[in-house]
Amino acid sequence: PEKARYAGKAEIAQPKLNLCRERLENGFYEAIPQLLRNYLIDKLTADAAARHIDAANDATNVFNNLLTERLTKPDGSQRRLATIPTGELIDGFGRLLAYVAPWYAGESDPLPPRDDPRRYTFNLNLIANGWAAFFPIYPSLPSNRDFNLAIAAAETAWTEKRGAWASYGDDLLLAYEYRACIKLAAAADAEEGIKKAFQRVCVDLRSLKIVGLYGFYDIPPCYRLWIWEQDLAEATEILNLVQE
């Protein structure tokens, strides 16, 4: 989830979400399919901003505890942090796309076997315990083996209602949903808002069916794959995607 720095503290962000809800209800965004509008409206509760920001802060605390736990060796000394770049190394916003994991130095601190949970990245840990949304974006995807591991972890976290879903409920806005709603509220007109809020095509990982810019509402979060519109033709061919 996003912290307060994205759209302000809850008392600042909530009026923006309220405006988004009003626009979704009053026809301002009639070009957005009704079922997607309903999906977002159900999540735009009176405390949506506070719950989202609180979940983000809780996730940070969980991550910090994981760092302490997994980077501390049995003798009390500290492991270094390994950074593993993947796919599109630098995204369109200048961010490094990478996985992070404990660095096992060698004989004195040997690398665990491949299937050992001690080999998991922190990214996978947070997905598995329900404190990070599963948000794979083509082409920045791991190997098939690691991708399937992440899907399974996300599925378990969702079906068992772990982490953020246990603490804040199924109607918690995920980070990309939160950002979309803020953009819908800020836009001067409907066309601008829709263009800024919905830039990635969603694919249902269960069937590899392309559900488009607006069909993600019908896909559980653990089965959503995202593709930038400009990458869709390439991804369709490489991943054998199915047109809806």
Per-segment meaning from a language model:
Residues 1-244:
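Small beta-barrel nucleic-acid-binding modules, primarily SNase/OB-fold domains
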